[in-house]
């Protein structure tokens, strides 16, 4: 497993505004989209390409195109949906799948309550979108789910991570071909497993509290 924290003034600035508790939901959504596009630029550096011959208005030349099958983008519901537009703006030809995961309140296990993915992910580069890597449980189960479908190259784009969650993920995934791309690794998890200083509940701040 590899981890990259994107060091860029625009990333730092947009993340600072996201953290501010006074930032309203419409601004939060817009900044999330912009921040994900910046992170995705780095996350796609190793996307698979092949040479293609094209005709310009002047002459024939050799350019670059994605190999087939094209990348698959998988937001984890619901907060990951707020990251999707920022990713597909950069990679509009990518296919999109979905994973819905939640913690069972009785067993505390992560359960998959919804999925819309190809049955066979062999040979696909998969980009998972999940804003907060706190304990790492949800992301771990999402990656395992994708591996069971045949994926072998998974990149996860997150806004924030806690050191504890990253360590747990690395312990369980080991040498698996997983790349984590982040805007920041924060200080710690608190007693409620919230990232500190964090930015609060990303889903609530993106969409408001439904209940």
Curated annotation (Swiss-Prot):
It holds the Pfam family UPRTase. The keyword DNA-binding does not apply. GO terms for molecular function: GTP binding; magnesium ion binding; uracil phosphoribosyltransferase activity. Binds 1 Mg(2+) ion per subunit. The magnesium is bound as Mg-PRPP. Keywords: Allosteric enzyme, Glycosyltransferase, GTP-binding, Magnesium, Nucleotide-binding, Transferase. GO terms for biological process: UMP salvage; uracil salvage. Uracil binds at residues 195, 200-202. The keyword Glycosyltransferase applies. It catalyses: UMP + diphosphate = 5-phospho-alpha-D-ribose 1-diphosphate + uracil. InterPro entries: PRibTrfase_dom (IPR000836), PRTase-like (IPR029057), Upp_B (IPR034332), UPRTase/APRTase (IPR050054), Ura_phspho_trans (IPR005765). Pathway: Pyrimidine metabolism; UMP biosynthesis via salvage pathway; UMP from uracil: step 1/1. Catalyzes the conversion of uracil and 5-phospho-alpha-D-ribose 1-diphosphate (PRPP) to UMP and diphosphate. This is Uracil phosphoribosyltransferase. It comes from Pseudarthrobacter chlorophenolicus (strain ATCC 700700 / DSM 12829 / CIP 107037 / JCM 12360 / KCTC 9906 / NCIMB 13794 / A6) (Arthrobacter chlorophenolicus). The gene is upp.
């Amino acid at each position: 497993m590899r981890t990259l924290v994107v060091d860029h003034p625009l990333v730092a600035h947009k993340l600072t505004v996201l953290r501010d508790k006074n930032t309203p939901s419409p601004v939060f959504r817009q900044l999330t989209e912009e921040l994900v596009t910046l992170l995705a630029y780095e996350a796609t550096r190793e996307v698979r390409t092949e040479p293609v011959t094209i005709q310009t208005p002047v002459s024939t030349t050799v350019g670059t195109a994605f190999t087939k099958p094209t990348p698959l983008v998988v937001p984890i519901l619901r907060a990951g949906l707020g990251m999707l537009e920022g990713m597909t703006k950069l990679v509009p030809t990518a296919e999109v799948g979905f994973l819905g995961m939640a913690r069972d309140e009785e067993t505390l296990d992560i359960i998959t309550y919804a999925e819309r993915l190809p049955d066979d992910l062999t040979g696909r580069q998969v980009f998972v979108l999940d804003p907060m890597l706190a304990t790492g449980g949800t992301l771990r189960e999402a990656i395992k789910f994708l591996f069971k479908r045949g994926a072998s190259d998974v990149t996860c784009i997150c806004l924030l991570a806690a050191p504890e969650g990253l360590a747990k993920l690395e312990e369980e995934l080991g040498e698996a071909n997983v790349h984590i791309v982040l805007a920041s690794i924060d200080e710690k998890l608190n007693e409620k497993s919230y990232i500190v200083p964090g930015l609060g509940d990303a889903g609530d701040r993106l969409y408001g509290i439904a209940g």
